[in-house]
Regions:
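Extended polysaccharide-engagement surfaces of secreted carbohydrate-active enzymes
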Residues: 155, 159-161, 166-172, 187
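Acidic/polar-rich alpha-helix caps and helix-coil junctions
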Residues: 1-158, 163, 201, 205-403
């Protein structure tokens, strides 16, 4: 049987319901190392906030969805997950307004504990105490795997000892180049992205140019590290693997970090008129970055930035606050494979592709690298459906517009 395509609104509603219900069932605390790789309620809460964010965003075409209500729902979940305000089962599920089955049937289907009612309050401290920001210069190291900042992490190593080790590469939007000295995500940042890092200490751990920084040589006697001298002049270096850290093949992939959720929450707070609270929330992430410039940070010696030039975000009106939060998110998550989806949900993908086409990068070899030149608005935001799937459906599945 071939199932016809659901509408975008139906799809989002299904995902949202699934995540809300899963929060009732998943473990509230983080898993121990021997259990690592399993998702807990914190991961589901982070994903729910991200789904609600997309539903509220201008680039997601949901004409029958109240986007203001979705912003408020992001804030509601953020107050539970981040600020520790308890929430009722009814408010979590939106049961009264969205369910047609009885509570008895629903609670039995979900295998909830006996005595759980719609008025049962969920203790926020169970999840709030499980996640926090880790040190920025450690979260992408081997030692940073399964840190309190990690909400969803794909386990590539068998910590349980039952012989199921999977030696895959990372599941990122790019491919990994392996050599004896290092491993690097082979997707090149733009010079425009690099310019966003002016006076930001996170640049050292995110983007590198052809100059070889001593930070990356501290673990090797080799005076040069090959990938700095490859064709592209800029490289993402967040996932650099020092020789002492072993093979890149067993590195985990963090799907979602607590820092991203803080910035999602900050954006939502600003959208519902709480701009000062939004700035305070975004500054939790920015203040963590400032710790890279602390005198007691051993990696400060590799920085060329003065702590006096890196300041917290200031309180400002809505538009300025929104731009500042989006910029903070772009910097914090650069090189983690989220940017394309970010500009699509913001509704600015067409103008960003035009910018790339109008400002082509020139390689050190002299070759022009053109991106965005053939982008078609309203078509290329999504991929085509494989034609074989369209064919075997006998007309039930229709190809995406423009393909």
């Amino acid at each position: 049987m071939v199932v016809p395509r659901s509408t975008l609104e139906e799809t989002y509603a299904y995902i949202e319901k699934d995540l809300r219900e899963s929060i009732l069932l998943l473990r509230k605390q983080r898993y121990q190392l021997s259990e690592a790789g399993q998702i807990s309620a914190g991961g589901a809460l982070g994903l729910l906030m991200k789904v609600l964010l997309y539903e509220a965003s201008p680039g997601v075409d949901l004409p029958n969805v109240d986007k203001t209500a979705k912003w408020n729902e992001v804030v509601e979940i953020g107050k539970y997950f981040i600020e520790g305000q308890n929430i009722s089962v009814n408010d979590l599920l939106k049961f009264d307004s969205r369910y047609t089955e009885s509570w008895d049937d629903a609670s039995e289907r979900l295998f909830l504990e006996e005595g759980t009612t719609l008025e049962t309050m969920m203790n926020a401290q169970d999840v709030v105490s499980s996640h926090s920001l880790s040190k920025f210069d450690e979260i992408f190291r081997i030692s940073g795997e399964f840190s309190p900042e990690s909400l969803i992490e794909i386990n590539q190593y068998d910590y349980s000892g039952v012989g199921i080790n999977e030696e895959h590469g990372w599941l990122l939007n790019g491919y990994i180049t392996y050599d004896p000295e290092s491993s690097i995500l082979n997707v090149s940042p733009t010079s425009e992205l690099q310019s966003q890092f002016e006076n930001d200490p996170r640049e050292l751990f995110t983007i590198s140019d052809r100059s070889i920084n001593d930070y990356y040589k501290q673990d090797t006697s080799n005076p040069e590290i090959g990938w700095f001298n490859s064709g592209n002049s800029l490289k993402f270096c967040k996932f650099y693997v020092f020789p002492s850290e072993g093979s890149a093949k067993m590195r985990n992939y963090v799907v979602m970090r607590y820092a991203e959720v803080l910035l999602i929450y900050a954006e939502a707070l600003n959208e519902v008129g709480l701009s000062r609270e939004a700035v305070d929330m975004a500054n939790r992430v920015r203040n963590r970055a400032a710790e890279l410039l602390d005198d007691d940070n051993p990696n400060k010696q590799y920085q060329t930035i003065s702590a006096a030039n890196f300041k917290p975000l200031s309180y400002a009106p809505y538009n300025i606050t929104r731009d500042a939060i989006l910029k903070e998110k772009r910097i914090e998550m650069a090189g983690e494979g989220d940017r394309w989806f970010e500009i699509c949900r913001l509704g600015i993908v067409s103008e960003r592709m035009k910018y790339l086409a109008d400002n082509p990068a020139v390689e050190p070899t002299g070759q022009t690298r053109v991106r965005g030149l053939h982008f078609k608005k309203g078509v290329n935001e999504i991929f085509p459906i494989p034609q074989e799937e369209v064919f075997i459906s006998n007309g039930v599945i229709e190809q995406n517009f423009g393909y």
